[in-house]
Amino acid sequence: MGSEMCIRDSATSESLMNDRLGGTTSSLDGGNIRYYGASPKNYVYFNCETYPSTNCELWRIIGVFDGKIKLIRNGSIGSYSWDTSVARINSGFGIAEWSQADIMKVLNPNYDSDSVGGSLYYNSKSGNCYNGQNNATISCDFTSTGIKNEITKKMIANFTWNFGMYSDSSDLYSNQIYVKERGTNVFANPSDGITRTSTWNGKIALPHPSDYGYATDFLKCTDNIFDVDETDKTFYNCGANDWMLRVGGTTDYWLLVPNNYHESGVNLAYVSGYLINATKASYAYGIIPTLYLEDQILHSGDGSQSNPYQLKA
């Protein structure tokens, strides 16, 4: 999970770093600002019944990107398919294309007419969601975990999400993954006939693999982002010092970016502390909503779990 980025670009007292856009800029102010380490003070109240602090959920700040605060929910909303399909399409394992993914339609607005999953999380409703091969479904209830009100919905930015693919993941570090995610490489000529894209404009998605990689402490972790050598002491240092490992609790959770190995392959964060590629999209794993805020201000709190930052709505 390590990075070739210089450690001098970090503020260790605050567990903040400048990622220098994966090393593509030398500007001191040109990169994204990220929280890293085992337990940074990056907790924030969000999805509140009344702002700034009444009946809120705990979320965590990944960092600041293009001037917008990027948040991830501090916990899964349940385990569901990233996508699934009928048996004749990719053997029922789904299509790794976020712009039409089943879970994307659960998380975002304007899919109310879909009989399964359609905007249920965004509208705090219950119904059925996909959770297995061959369009298998399960009941799902977001009445207490979904987006609570119009005030919160207006705080969520429409943002251009990047998910360029990569096939040489075993040799890549966090900064290299970040650059590839912002690239245009996609799965070429898929047998399912669905054109793949490398960007999507919308409100709610899933964390990037690079987010997970950059969340560790590079002074203690030098492995690459997909290292699976569990006999290596450094491997344990990576997971032990990565706050994003804990947002899923004991649940493996889905990431945003597909991979280049097969038509149904998507990246997964594994609770042992590393990432797995080529996981079938139809499998049911944790879903952790991730989003960007409009121009919100953190106006109180210190970011600790007991005194989270509060947003001025």
Where are these regions (language model features)?
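Long, domain-scale functional regions
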Residues: 3, 8-313
